[in-house]
Amino acid sequence: MSTPSGLIAPHGGQLINRIASDAEKQEFLAQGDRLPRITLDARAQSDLEMIAIGGFSPLKGFMEQKDYELVVEEMHLSNGLPWSVPVTLSVSEEIADPLKEGNWVRLDDANGRFIGVLELTEKYHYNKAHEAINVYRTDEEKHPGVKVVYEQGAVNLAGPVWLLERDDHPLFPKYQIDPAASRAAFQERGWKTVVGFQTRNPIHRAHEYIIKCALETVDGLFLHPLVGATKSDDIPADVRMRCYEIMLENYFPQERVILAINPSAMRYAGPREAIFHALIRKNYGCTHFIVGRDHAGVGDYYGTYDAQKIFDEFDPQALGITPMKFEHAFFCKKTEQMATSKTSPSGPEDRIHLSGTKVREMLRRGELPPPQFSRPLVAAELAKAMHD
């Protein structure tokens, strides 16, 4: 389904906007001291922001129990739309008990600033182990996503939200592009087909290869790295962003690429998160989404191509965004170029496999990744950052 502008429609048909108007904001601020308050952690705050700007359309707030249970068990909302990851606000029993359904709740950031409100429609208990097994395919607490589930409160608070305060990103304000703005940018450029690429790593040669393969078949690329909460051993966002800038300045046609930050937090939910990431990019205006090996995976919890296979479980029209599935790319010594097993004549001994993990390991040892791994300008930037 497309909009009158010719762009793909947001998930559910309407781009949600839950940013309070000035008048609404003043009304809520005037009540602030009288409202019960909750302090949001980094993930809940990024979820609030993504709901408000329409990145999580059709969600208007944190999930009620009927949606939560359907998403956990069947990967659909109660209105039938595909949705694969629960978006919830979890608090302790002590915080939840005095809150009354039908009332407003003040949402504060970690500094105690009043940034949003929740119209509490429901509070409910949930089964953490059930969520972990269904969403993450494991209940092991060493899995970073499962760890978050087990550490969060026992009660979910549900209801529509309004965002009152939102800062420019402290490091990347010029790349803070909301779904309404990305859609306007695609339309201005005349792009009818746009491929989205999600990453939390610097772009190495395997990434570059599959991105350029995808770009051959569409009008534009939406490079959308995640800068919300990630694992502690991931390369810092400021270093990654500089690497993306270097890649675009030197190795891509700049008029066919838009770089923007994705403020949402990683769940590390593997296959389910691949669906989640695709739907988010649909809301930003993408028609296609790149799914490579072990998308949004961690450790050995998911099969190499499980994140591609999960798309086959959905009606393509209901998803409304086309996955572009790529095999693991490598440097082929026989042909001296990037390839996959679909295009390379070489055997395993002539294939140099690349990964963000290998790059990080080399950098920690003080080694520069070879040009088959990483573009020299990017490798130099990574090495500089590692030893600053």
UniProtKB/Swiss-Prot annotation:
Root EC class: transferase
Keyword Nucleotidyltransferase: yes
EC number(s) from the headed UniProt entry: 2.7.7.4
Gene3D superfamilies recorded: HUPs (3.40.50.620), Sulfate adenylyltransferase (3.10.400.10)
The reaction(s) this protein catalyses: sulfate + ATP + H(+) = adenosine 5'-phosphosulfate + diphosphate
Gene Ontology BP term (one): sulfate assimilation
Iron found in the keyword field: no
InterPro entries xrefs: ATP-Sase_PUA-like_dom, PUA-like_sf, Rossmann-like_a/b/a_fold, SO4_adenylyltransferase_pro, Sulfurylase_cat_dom, Sulphate_adenylyltransferase
Single GO MF annotation: ATP binding
SUPFAM superfamilies found in the cross-reference section: Nucleotidylyl transferase (SSF52374), PUA domain-like (SSF88697)
Keyword annotations of the record: ATP-binding, Nucleotide-binding, Nucleotidyltransferase, Transferase
Superkingdom of the source species: Bacteria
Sections of the chain in a coiled coil: none
Pathway in which this enzyme or protein is active: Sulfur metabolism; hydrogen sulfide biosynthesis; sulfite from sulfate: step 1/3
Similarity remark: Belongs to the sulfate adenylyltransferase family.
PANTHER family: PTHR43509, SULFATE ADENYLYLTRANSFERASE
Official protein name in the record: Sulfate adenylyltransferase
Lineage of producing organism: Bacteria, Bacillati, Cyanobacteriota, Cyanophyceae, Oscillatoriophycideae
Gene: sat
